[in-house]
Swiss-Prot record:
Gene3D superfamilies: 1.20.5.170, 1.20.5.340. This is Tropomyosin. Residues 1-284 form a coiled coil. Keywords: Allergen, Coiled coil, Repeat. Homodimer. Belongs to the tropomyosin family. Tropomyosin, in association with the troponin complex, plays a central role in the calcium dependent regulation of muscle contraction.
Length: 284
């Protein structure tokens, strides 16, 4: 009888210990479930953050694509402006060559005019000298008259040459006026072309400044993409670590649940054994 009581006490103590262990296992299981739920919330938060970072990365890539498109358009505009500058330079060169030829023709016409003026002056001097010469020698009168006739003929010829020279001079002056007008027109065109060239130069400077700003924006976008990529990798690494932690916690929860089931089965076995013992004692 004493042995049975001792056995019952031992079984009761073992039962109490089993209940304590079961409660501890249940508490551990609850704690593990809480940790698992917290880890799952962290995983969901990380996944949401990853999605947000991916969206931001898409936006940055779209902005970069738009910046590249604008940069290509500006490069095309720069090439067009450079072509316009080259065309203007060719036009300026042609105008300068035309101006040089006009100046050369003007020099030639001026030289011819000076020669004609000198010839006319010489003829006029000879005519005046012959007209005002007074010769009293009758023997030389006939010769002088012949000379006078010749001089008159020469004077008339000189007059004709003078008229021709005057006519040519008028033509040369007209050509000179036209050349001066062309030169003035050329100078006006040169001024206009220089103004156009200055405007194109300013446009080129503006395009260069815009290109530098576009390059700076592109570098900033690339830097932002690198930062976003780094953040994405870090978030993915944290997500993987959290998933591994969740898996470990789930394994721990499974192990604790198995231990709890084992303790419950053990408790049930002890309870059945106690019931059987009480039944035996009662029958006894």
């Amino acid at each position: 009888m004493e042995a049975i009581k001792n056995k019952m006490q031992a079984m009761k103590l073992e039962k109490d210990n089993a209940i304590d262990r079961a409660e501890i296992a249940e508490q551990k299981a609850r704690d593990a479930n809480l940790r698992a739920e917290k880890s799952e919330e962290e995983v969901r938060a990380l996944q949401k953050k990853i999605q947000q970072i991916e969206n931001e990365l898409d936006q940055v890539q779209e902005q970069l694509s738009a910046a590249n498109t604008k940069l290509e358009e500006k490069e095309k505009a720069l090439q067009t402006a450079e072509g316009d500058v080259a065309a203007l330079n060719r036009r300026i060169q042609l105008i300068e060559e035309d101006l040089e030829r006009s100046e050369e023709r003007l020099k030639i016409a001026t030289a011819k005019l000076e020669e004609a003026s000198q010839s006319a002056d010489e003829s006029e001097r000879m005519r005046k000298m012959l007209e005002h010469r007074s010769i009293t020698d009758e023997e030389r009168m006939e010769g002088l008259e012949n000379q006078l006739k010749e001089a008159r003929m020469m004077a008339e010829d000189a007059d004709r040459k003078y008229d021709e020279v005057a006519r040519k001079l008028a033509m040369v002056e007209a050509d000179l006026e036209r050349a001066e007008e062309r030169a003035e027109t050329g100078e006006s065109k040169i001024v206009e072309l220089e103004e156009e060239l200055r405007v194109v130069g300013n446009n080129l400077k503006s395009l260069e400044v815009s290109e530098e700003k576009a390059q700076q924006r592109e570098e900033a976008h690339e830097q932002q993409i690198r930062i976003m990529t780094t953040k994405l990798k870090e978030a993915e690494a944290r997500a993987e670590f959290a998933e591994r932690s969740v898996q470990k916690l789930q394994k721990e929860v499974g192990r604790l649940e198995d231990e709890l089931v084992h303790e419950k089965e053990k408790y049930k076995s002890i309870s059945d054994e106690l019931d059987q013992t009480f039944a035996e004692l009662t029958g006894y």
